[in-house]
Amino acid sequence: MRSLTGMPRLVALVALSAFAGPSAWADTLADKLTPHVGETIDLVELGTGRRFVRPVLAGVVEKNDAVTGLRLRAEGQKTVTTVSLSGIAKIVADRETVHEAETTGRAFAQLRGRRGREAYDRQAEASAARMKANGVEPWPQLTAEEHAAEVTSLKAFVTEIRQKFPGLAVSETHEFLVASDVPPAQLAPFVANLDSMHDFLCELYGMPTGEPLWKGKCLVIAFLNEADYVAFEEGVLKSGMQGTQGVCHQRSDGRVIMVCHRGADPAAFAHMLVHETCHGFNHRWMTPQRLPNWLNEGIAEWVGTRVVKNCEQVPLKEARAAAFMRSKGTLGPGFFTAANIEPMQYGMASGMVRMLISRDARKFAEFVRGIKEGTPVEESLQRSFGGSLDDLVKAYGAAVGVPNLSTTDE
């Protein structure tokens, strides 16, 4: 679902009685919303199923001491739109659902929106049943208080590391907490790519935008200089990352910390930010189940090309990978099984992901979802696309001009 950026005011004034009108809960709703006036809230979903994602709550409209509507400024917009409370299905602020209406109306648009939500709920129930059958536990559903506590903990961690790296300045988006010594004017467009990546993956996987995904927020620590990046990794997180530009730390408790340095190429920096945080998103989506490395890297590379339009890294990697495959006739060692694929294989991984998504994005989401539910990779591929890994290699080989492409090194 997309946010309502640029939606005409007339469309936003949903006055049809799809939901129960203002009543006793409207009084308490005012108490819950008033502290957020002037701030960005998570979500306002209309009865039609359309959504304001990360809007600014410009004001609360009241009549006879009851809430009758909201004044919202859609993300990235300057104008304020008034939305009737009778047409609102759900309001989420500070990770807390502060309003969820009971459906009563019969108008076609509202029924369509309700059916969409019911279909998503049925999918979630079926997914939960498959997880249970596979012995897989989903990530815990956190309360608003638990999300807030995690953000507080992350900020305390940043305060601690600023004692060693005092140049780090702290900023926030709705989904990300950012600590960086990169000049703010230089950093801003790159940080904007992070929220774009978040929304893009929500749409790819069929996850409603505006719903909580991270544990609190994803922490991004971006250094200007490589030496500080290496010193932080070795001295604070006790990991050796010499020779890399960024890394995504994905903890078993759900916390995600992405650390990087700017480097000399702005487009490469932008792509790397998206690539690494994409790994964090995949870690947090649904369950802790790990994706195979070729798929995880392929998704991260492909998403980077969609979010960072001016980055030529991935097409160049795919071209080099194609030349390698034409020369060797193989994907190289352990492509489907390696814990970490070889640098040459990144272009193969992104090429396979791009091919699968271009064939059917919905089936691709089902394929990834199946793995996160605990289904073995090849079984999930068979269920979604009707083929095996060997079939995938044959199709990909044909696409890159290597009809006899092999997975072996022979």
Describe each model-derived feature in a short phrase:
Residues 1-7:
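N-terminal secretory signal peptides that target proteins for export/translocation
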Residues 5, 22-23:
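Intrinsically disordered, low-complexity terminal regions
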Residues 9-21:
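Bacterial N-terminal signal peptides
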Residues 25-166:
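Compositionally biased alpha-helical segments
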Residues 52, 81, 177-178, 389:
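Short, isolated positions in well-ordered beta-strands
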Residues 165-291, 376-384:
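Juxtacatalytic substrate-recognition/specificity segment
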Residues 239-256, 268, 272, 287-410:
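Acidic/His/Gly-enriched intrinsically disordered linker/tail segments
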